[in-house]
Amino acid sequence: MSEALTELASYLGEARGNLIAASQLKYGELTLTATGENLIPLLTFLRDDAKCGFVNLIDICGVDWPQRELRFDVVYHLLSPKKNLRIRVKVATDEDTPVPSACGLYPGADWFERETWDMYGVLFTGHPDLRRILTDYGFEGHPLRKDFPTTGFVEVRYDDAAKRVVYEPVELKQEFRNFDFMSPWEGTEYVLPGDEKAKQ
């Protein structure tokens, strides 16, 4: 599998190196980094080129890196059924710079982009219906951002006496605790970001 990905990375560098800002083959996974203006041409090439054939969009997700100037990564996971290969394409952006929508290439991108906007606040230009998909209508903020409080801002519950859903400020029943535990499960052999202290 990694041999096929190595060949694919080499081919992409030769055929469309101008669209790829960086390429990384690590842990048996190929990740391409692109800029916002090169995203749609790169995704189009990956879908339409006979040596690629990435016709399936598996997922779009966001990653929040608050310490970076371009704090968000929008990550596209693609599958080539004919080649039996998966690839990842990343685009970095900030709170104010929108990313071009991939709905014209992959109709399934619609709800994935809505989810990424809902959870992280990343805007997508050209999206046909960019609105919340998982949070409530009046929800404020984006809950997967690292600066969003883990307790949230409001509590939503059904009030049996009033026979309706009510919104109230969050009231913690006990003193807030912050635990810094090591992960109890046996994970990968390589060190993931944030696990550096585990080796000490």
UniProtKB/Swiss-Prot annotation:
Origin organism lineage: Bacteria, Pseudomonadati, Pseudomonadota, Alphaproteobacteria, Hyphomicrobiales
InterPro entries: NADH_DH_suC, NADH_quin_OxRdtase_su_C/D-like, NADH_UbQ_OxRdtase_30kDa_su, NADH_UbQ_OxRdtase_CS
Record gene name: nuoC1
Keyword set includes Translocase: yes
NCBIfam families: NuoC_fam, PRK06074.1-5
Protein EC: 7.1.1.-
EC top class, as a word: translocase
Protein name: NADH-quinone oxidoreductase subunit C 1
Claim: Transport is one of the keywords in the record: yes
Domain of life from the UniProt record: Bacteria
Catalytic activity: a quinone + NADH + 5 H(+)(in) = a quinol + NAD(+) + 4 H(+)(out)
Xref: Gene3D superfamilies: NADH:ubiquinone oxidoreductase, 30kDa subunit
